[in-house]
């Protein structure tokens, strides 16, 4: 007898004694008469017995409000349980009452021996058209194999069923994936996963891989049979299909255990694909195109998490120092992953293309601001709702705090840019680059930060060098090493300017270069070993060229001796070797030194023929001279070696500008510089040319050697230098040479000679003298009108010359010539003629000067017309500007009550200007007398022999005086001429001398 007790709380409600074979235990009611309380409890037990028994066999259900309740078993269910218990008891009693049996054979794995198998006769079907046979579906049995070889090996339906059950148990326990391969279909993959319904079978569908088909799973009959056996291991739990959602795709449910709207299936199970219009869709059903597109598949999350899990495992760190364990809730980890995604890439849906496009098209600043704001909100959510993930909140705060780093001090950036923006040399360029990086703040890339450190390193080195070099005013630590990199001249790298041999094609530049060679170069006459060209005269001494080494000896010993050259007295680094500005060294304007601080001395420089050599401190570059010029050897005239600098600039001039460039150099630059100008004048001229032709600022300089002993800069041409021991100037380009033009530059070298006298050869006095000659020389005046028309303005320096110019008809001649060229020259001539008429009326010199000064400003406005490549134009502009400014200043001086001495000096100045003109005019007046006397003497030669001696001597004295006045000499000498007929007149004069 077995006793069952039913308890409610702490009270015993019912005690039942059951026999082992009884399906339901009988209720025992005591027969004795109980007391009053016992009777009440007995009645309650009798009343609740059946209800509690049904409740014991009930199931737990959760309603829509989340309340868990016990659903009691139905009466039908209770009767079934009683019948099942009775059957089990009867089966056990029958087994125990059965007689003893002998075991005669043992069969392993439940198979049937071949001897016991019966041969099955296969009856072929008759192919007739008849009614469709009714399909009979069996529940869970596998059809016997028809293959004879399988039957011979003992494969029976029961053995295959056992195999499937064993594999199902293994997959359910380990989670491995199974593949079922049918006769006609592809492999069907399935595995057992743990869900809220228990361990459920999940089939791999096509849409799990992103493939959308009308039939999501294709299986044949044999595959379905095997899958049915495997599905027996699925949890047999009542399920409501209406609660299925994402992640339920591929799950298998038995039809008799589920409730809710679903699609009908041929089998007794359904494979979840998705939901269409509230109806659960089976994966094996063939859908229409529209139904397939409207079906809401339940595998999106599964695909996402499968990719997330795979990528997470592939990229996890391999050098972990501990064994990982599952300490956090998986659901909470999913929430954290979503928050991190929203902080990095804010969006409405992670699969939304519009959100992705919006983030992509947003500018950097706006996106960072939006992203930072979202990160702050998410960080607060993590701290409040997920305290276990404080590390994530810390990461977000640190990461986005760097994103928000901005440089608020924009004013400092502007001030730095104002200070160093105009400098193009180190360290100002490094300061400017560092300033550009610092203003970026958090937007600076790692490469830019590394570049900032490099710029800061260069600034640090500069400050250290400056401190060391300027300390105590000593040059002991001065270093100015030569650049290790050769200068890249882009004009020599363009393929269009080079021939097939890599030589420069001069083009029109070579033709216009003749203006240099014809005016400032001498043609070398070969012969005598070029001895007459070896010594080069300089203002304070000589320098020897290596032109004699063009004749090369084949004796190696003698050749080595020639390569030694002739050394001058070597000078150490002194104050003259450096140039400073604002207490800083201008390194391009200093002499080159070695690593130990000693100067770099020049060595023997080999000569070449017909080359232009450029490249100062680096490796020299040899350019062939233009083809028309290279047929002969040219050498710069004495005092004009600086022409090689302008010739080097011509390399970087466009061919269309070559004519204008060479004319400017010939008509403006060289006349101002003359012979042996100072370096500061040459640098200023280069600056003027680079303003018109910016590309020339990058032109390379010829080699320049510094002679501190003679205070001279030697511009080395292609004939090299035999003398050695000179210092080397570091400046390598025209831009670097222009730095010598600064008045604030503290340098002795800028006053060294490179060519000319200190005063210009073309000045106002020389011009007025030429105008005085041209007044009485029509050919010279015509040449001035054609070539230098603005020279006529210089006649305003002298009222007398201005009147003579107007009376000679030169202004009318100019008007007829200029009327075809432009209005400015014609207006200039009319104004000069008007001023001359007004001046001729005045008697006093100072009144005439006042009339000229009053017209200076108006004439300046008339002729000022941009830049004209003409030396007389600049000279006229300069003179008129001086007159206008002098007029304005004198007026202010007179208003304040002061007196100028200009009135007293005007007559003296006019007298000095007219003195050579007066002598010349006297000689011109006497010219006709000389001509007439010569003719008279020739005609009356015979008649003078009859004259008295006293009259003949008087005639000789008159002729001698006329000749002296005409030639401008006090001791005039009349050369004998067989054509003059004056031998008898010239003879006494020659005897006198």
Swiss-Prot record:
GO terms for biological process: proteolysis; symbiont-mediated suppression of host innate immune response; transport of virus in host, cell to cell; viral translational frameshifting. It is an enzyme of class 3 (hydrolase). GO terms for cellular component: host cell plasmodesma. Residues 633-755 form the Peptidase C6 domain. Keywords: Host cell junction, Host-virus interaction, Hydrolase, Inhibition of host innate immune response by virus, Protease, Serine protease, Suppressor of RNA silencing, Transport, Viral immunoevasion, Viral movement protein. Transmembrane segments: none annotated. The active site is at residues 207, 216, 249, 641, 714. Pfam families: Peptidase_C6, Peptidase_S30, Potyvirid-P3. One of its GO terms (molecular function) is cysteine-type endopeptidase activity. Belongs to the potyviridae P3N-PIPO polyprotein family. The N-terminus of helper component proteinase is involved in interaction with stylets. The central part is involved in interaction with virions and the C-terminus is involved in cell-to cell movement of the virus. This is P3N-PIPO polyprotein.
């Amino acid at each position: 007898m077995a006793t069952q007790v039913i308890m409610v709380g702490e009270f015993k409600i019912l005690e039942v004694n059951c026999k082992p074979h009884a399906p339901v235990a009988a209720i025992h009611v005591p027969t004795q008469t109980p007391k009053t309380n016992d009777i009440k409890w007995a009645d309650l037990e009798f009343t609740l017995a059946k209800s509690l028994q049904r409740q014991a066999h009930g199931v737990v259900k959760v309603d829509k409000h989340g309340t868990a309740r016990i659903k009691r078993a139905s009466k039908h269910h209770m009767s079934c349980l009683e019948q099942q218990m009775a059957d089990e008891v009867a089966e056990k009693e029958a087994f125990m009452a059965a007689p003893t049996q002998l075991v005669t054979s043992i069969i392993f794995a439940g198979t049937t021996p071949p001897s016991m198998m019966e041969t099955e006769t296969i009856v072929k079907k008759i192919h007739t058209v008849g009614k469709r046979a009714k399909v009979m579906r069996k529940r869970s049995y596998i059809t016997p194999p028809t293959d004879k070889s399988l039957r011979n090996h003992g494969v029976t339906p029961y053995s295959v069923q056992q195999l499937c059950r064993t594999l199902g148990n293994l997959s359910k326990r380990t989670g491995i994936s199974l593949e079922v391969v049918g006769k006609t279909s592809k492999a069907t993959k399935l595995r057992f996963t743990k869900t809220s319904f228990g361990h459920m079978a999940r089939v791999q569908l096509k849409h799990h891989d992103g493939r959308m088909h009308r039939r999501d799973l294709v299986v044949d009959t044999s595959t379905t049979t095997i899958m049915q056996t495997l599905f027996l291991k699925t949890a047999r739990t009542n399920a409501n299909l209406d609660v299925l959602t994402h992640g339920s795709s591929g799950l298998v449910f038995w039809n008799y255990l589920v409730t809710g709207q679903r699609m009908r299936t041929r089998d007794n199970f359904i494979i979840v694909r998705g939901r269409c219009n509230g109806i659960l869709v089976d994966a094996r059903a063939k859908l229409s195109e529209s139904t397939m597109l409207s079906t809401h598949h339940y595998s999106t999350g599964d695909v996402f998490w499968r990719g997330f899990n795979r990528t997470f495992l592939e990229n996890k760190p391999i050098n972990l120092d501990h064994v990982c364990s599952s300490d956090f809730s998986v659901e909470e980890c999913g929430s954290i992953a979503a928050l991190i995604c929203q902080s990095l890439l804010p969006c409405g849906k992670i699969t939304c293309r519009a959100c992705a496009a919006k983030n992509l098209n947003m500018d950097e600043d706006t996106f960072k601001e939006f992203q930072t704001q979202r990160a702050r909100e998410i960080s607060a959510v993590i701290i409040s709702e997920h305290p276990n993930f404080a590390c994530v909140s810390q990461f977000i705060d640190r990461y986005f705090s760097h994103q928000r780093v901005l440089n608020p001090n924009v004013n400092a950036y502007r001030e730095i840019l104002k200070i160093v923006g105009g400098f193009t040399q180190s360290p100002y360029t490094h300061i400017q680059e560092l300033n550009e990086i610092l203003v970026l703040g958090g937007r600076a890339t790692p490469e830019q930060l590394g570049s900032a450190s490099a710029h800061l390193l260069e600034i640090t080195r500069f400050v250290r060098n400056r401190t060391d070099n300027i300390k105590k005013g000593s040059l002991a630590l001065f270093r100015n090493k030569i650049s290790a990199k050769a200068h890249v001249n882009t004009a020599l790298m363009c393929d269009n300017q080079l021939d097939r041999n890599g030589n420069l094609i001069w083009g029109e530049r070579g033709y216009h270069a003749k203006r240099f060679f014809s005016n400032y170069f001498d043609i070398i006459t070969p012969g005598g070993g070029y001895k007459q060209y070896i010594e080069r005269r300089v203002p304070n001494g000589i320098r020897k060229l290596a032109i004699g080494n063009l004749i090369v000896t084949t004796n190696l010993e003698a050749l080595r001796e020639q390569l030694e050259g002739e050394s001058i007295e070597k000078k150490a680094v002194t104050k003259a070797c450096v140039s400073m500005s604002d207490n800083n060294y201008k390194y391009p304007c200093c002499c080159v030194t070695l690593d130990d601080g000693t100067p770099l001395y020049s060595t023997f420089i080999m000569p070449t023929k017909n080359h232009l050599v450029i490249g100062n401190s680096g490796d020299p570059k040899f350019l062939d001279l233009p083809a028309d010029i290279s047929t002969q050897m040219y050498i710069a005239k004495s005092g004009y070696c600086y022409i090689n600098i302008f010739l080097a600039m011509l390399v970087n001039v466009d061919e269309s500008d070559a004519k204008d460039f060479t004319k400017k150099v010939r008509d403006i630059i060289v006349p101002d510089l003359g012979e042996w100008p100072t370096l500061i004048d040459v640098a200023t001229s280069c600056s003027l040319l680079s303003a018109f032709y910016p590309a020339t600022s990058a032109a390379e300089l010829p080699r320049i050697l510094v002679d501190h002993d003679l205070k001279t800069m030697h511009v080395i041409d292609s004939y090299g230098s035999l003398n050695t021991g000179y210092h080397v100037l570091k400046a390598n380009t025209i831009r670097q040479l222009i730095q010598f033009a600064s008045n604030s530059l503290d340098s002795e070298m800028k006053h060294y000679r490179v060519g000319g006298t200190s005063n210009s050869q073309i000045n106002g006095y020389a011009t007025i003298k030429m105008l005085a000659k041209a007044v009485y020389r029509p050919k010279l005046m015509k040449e001035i009108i054609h070539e230098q028309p603005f020279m006529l303005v210089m006649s305003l320096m002298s009222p007398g010359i201005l009147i003579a110019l107007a009376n000679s008809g030169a202004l009318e001649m100019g008007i007829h010539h200029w009327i075809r060229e432009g209005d400015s020259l014609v207006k200039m001539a009319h104004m000069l003629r008007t001023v001359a008429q007004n001046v001729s009326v005045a008697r006093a010199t100072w009144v005439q000067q006042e009339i000229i000064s009053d017209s200076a400003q108006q004439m300046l406005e008339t002729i000022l017309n941009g830049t004209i490549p003409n030396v007389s134009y600049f000279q006229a502009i300069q003179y008129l500007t001086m007159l206008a400014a002098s007029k304005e200043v004198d007026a202010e001086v007179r208003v304040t009550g002061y007196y100028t001495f200009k009135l007293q000096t005007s007559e003296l100045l006019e007298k000095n200007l007219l003195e050579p003109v007066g002598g010349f005019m006297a000689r011109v007046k006497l010219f006709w007398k000389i001509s007439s006397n010569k003719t008279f003497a020739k005609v009356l030669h015979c008649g003078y022999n009859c004259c008295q001696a006293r009259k003949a001597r008087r005639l000789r004295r008159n002729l001698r005086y006329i000749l002296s006045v005409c030639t401008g000499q006090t001791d005039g000498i009349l050369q004998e001429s067989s054509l003059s007929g004056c031998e008898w007149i010239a003879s006494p004069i020659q005897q006198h001398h």
